[in-house]
Swiss-Prot record:
Participates in both transcription termination and antitermination. GO terms for molecular function: DNA-binding transcription factor activity; nucleotide binding; RNA binding. Belongs to the NusA family. InterPro entries: DNA_repair_Rad51/TF_NusA_a-hlx, KH_dom, KH_dom-like_a/b, KH_dom_NusA-like, KH_sf_prok-type, NA-bd_OB-fold, NusA_bac, NusA_N_sf. It is found in: Cytoplasm. NCBIfam families: NusA, nusA_Cterm_rpt. Gene3D superfamilies: 3.30.300.20, 5' to 3' exonuclease, C-terminal subdomain, Nucleic acid-binding proteins, NusA, N-terminal domain. One of its GO terms (cellular component) is cytosol. This is Transcription termination/antitermination protein NusA. It comes from the Bacteria. The lineage of its organism: Bacteria, Pseudomonadati, Pseudomonadota, Alphaproteobacteria, Rickettsiales. It comes from Rickettsia conorii (strain ATCC VR-613 / Malish 7). Keywords: Cytoplasm, RNA-binding, Transcription, Transcription antitermination, Transcription regulation, Transcription termination. Its main location: cytoplasm.
Length: 503
């Protein structure tokens, strides 16, 4: 039997528990496990050994556990009922008998166990506590102190926790030093066994949204809604705002008296200039608003191509640079804000492009449908720019064209269908020859022509798609109406398919 007072261990445990905010019982149990491991090392792993620490005195006992059975098969872990009754008159089959083992060097073992195991358990418990304290704070703005800088990443002290701002999540040009105060957006909280668990960002769009919520009470109270955000962090941003109550001026409310509200946000984001525009469910009007500082009256024409998810904005020569912005920043942010690909062109450019498209589509229709030039021109003028559009159109749409009787309309539609079918057959044959998986064709849901472009680029399987980046996808399919989010979802789905195949 070991009957050694070890009040010092309890004092250490009590001190650590208070300082680190960790359960005292967890630390005691951890030390018991370490002493138990030392006992098994001395007496043999074949024994069922248990360590006990008295929660009041610190007394340590090392016990051998024997299971009471009818027929003893293992004398190291079992005991007969007859023998057990000698030790405990109330013993019965299935109970356990505890025998005290001779002491080991508890002073040394306990001290080492306390030092090593408590240290490790404190680290684990602190990480668990950090995760549980912050997992529900994802999506918040948080304040901290710069603790240190590691290879461009900033380690932030959050009092009882540490967070990290990766280099690519910092605004370009920012220069933080140890002990600087810093404000950031909690982008993610992950339970990890090592390394950072709390990930912060200063470039996330939601950082801007949360800052406006702090500065504009009407946003916090949902009187004003931020409908969309586009950022070039540290340089320029655009936000689209809306108020259901027509008596509220959402733009003015966000700007504030003498610009005090928007200035507060700008100052926090290293001088990032912010255009606050009015959101509208009328796409054309929203496009006009999003292109600020271009004045609405300077826009000559807006052409919306829903099939290609593209908008062409026609302006005068002198206003083109304003609309596009420095290095294309204004139109790029407006495109992100509205979710549409916006193309700025002058009246001269638009006229030239239309003429080129007219000539190209006319020639295409003449060749593909085997029709005279005048019919090809009429189809082009009506707005058709592909044979596929004609093949999928209603007969009633074609008969609206001047001079198109029903018989002619049916004939042209049939020729278009035959042309498209033949073209698709040829593409399918090429896809088969290239070894493209049918599963890839199904998941992409793009035209066969675009899928052929992917295949010729080397994307032939689900796994190939999973290895693509969003930019690679967009470069291969620049005119598709797939949003960045949907592209990410496609790639993610492809990766999951690949993982299932490997498992």
């Amino acid at each position: 039997m070991s009957n050694i007072g070890n009040v010092e261990i309890l004092q250490i445990i009590d001190s650590v528990a208070r300082e680190k905010g960790i359960s005292k019982e967890i630390l005691i149990s951890t030390v018991e496990q370490a002493v138990q491991a030392a006992g098994r090392k001395k007496y043999g792993n074949e024994y069922d050994i248990k360590a006990q620490i008295n929660r009041k005195t610190g007394e340590i006992n090392l016990l051998r556990i024997l299971k009471i059975v009818e027929d003893v098969e293992d004398y190291l872990t079992q005991i007969s009922l007859e023998e057990a009754l000698i030790k405990n008159p109330e013993a019965k089959i299935g109970d356990e008998i505890y025998e005290y083992l001779p002491p080991i060097d508890h002073a040394r073992v306990s001290a080492q166990a306390a030092k090593q195991v408590i240290t490790q358990r404190v680290i684990e418990a602190e990480r668990e506590k950090q995760y549980h304290d912050f997992k529900d704070r994802k999506g918040e703005i948080i304040n901290g102190i710069v603790k240190r800088i590691e290879y461009g990443d900033i380690i932030v002290d959050l009092s009882r926790a540490e967070a990290i701002i990766k280099k690519d999540q910092l605004i370009k040009g920012e220069n933080f030093k140890p002990n600087d105060r810093i404000k950031a957006y909690v982008q993610d909280v992950r339970q990890e066994t090592k390394g950072p668990q709390i990930f912060l960002s200063r470039v996330d769009n939601q950082m801007l949204v949360k800052l406006f919520k702090l500065e504009v009470p009407e946003i916090l109270e949902s009187i004003i809604q931020i409908k969309s955000v586009a950022r070039d962090p540290g340089s320029k941003a655009k936000i689209a705002v809306f108020a259901a109550d027509s008596s509220i001026d959402p733009v003015g409310s966000c700007v504030g008296i003498r610009g005090n509200r928007v200035k507060a946000v700008t100052n926090e984001l290293n001088g990032e200039k912010i255009d606050i525009v009015l959101w509208s469910n009328d796409l054309a009007q929203f496009i006009v608003n999003a292109l600020a500082p271009l004045a609405p009256g300077e826009i000559t024409k807006i052409l919306i191509d829903e099939d290609r998810h593209k908008v062409e904005v026609v302006v005068s020569q002198e206003n083109q640079s304003i609309a596009i912005g420095r290095r294309g920043q204004n139109v790029r942010l407006a495109s992100q804000l509205t979710g549409w690909n916006i193309d700025i062109m002058t009246e001269e450019q638009e006229s030239k492009r239309r003429n080129e498209e007219f000539l190209t589509s006319t020639a295409l229709f003449m060749e593909a449908l085997d029709v005279e030039e005048v019919i090809g021109q009429l189809l082009s003028v009506t707005g058709f720019n592909s044979v596929e559009q004609i093949a999928s159109s209603e007969i009633s749409t074609l008969t609206r064209i001047e001079g198109f009787e029903e018989e002619l309309a049916v004939e042209i539609k049939n020729r278009a269908i035959n042309y498209v079918d033949l073209k698709n057959e040829k593409i399918i044959k090429k896809l088969e020859d290239l070894g493209v998986e049918q599963e890839l064709i199904d998941i992409l849901e793009l035209s066969l022509e675009l899928i052929l472009q992917f295949a010729e680029y080397g994307i032939k399987t689900i796994e190939d798609l999973g290895e693509m980046s969003v930019n690679e996808f967009k470069n291969l399919a620049p005119n598709s109406n797939i949003t960045d989010e949907n592209i990410k979802l496609l790639i993610k789905t492809a990766r999951q398919h690949g993982a299932l195949k490997d498992s």
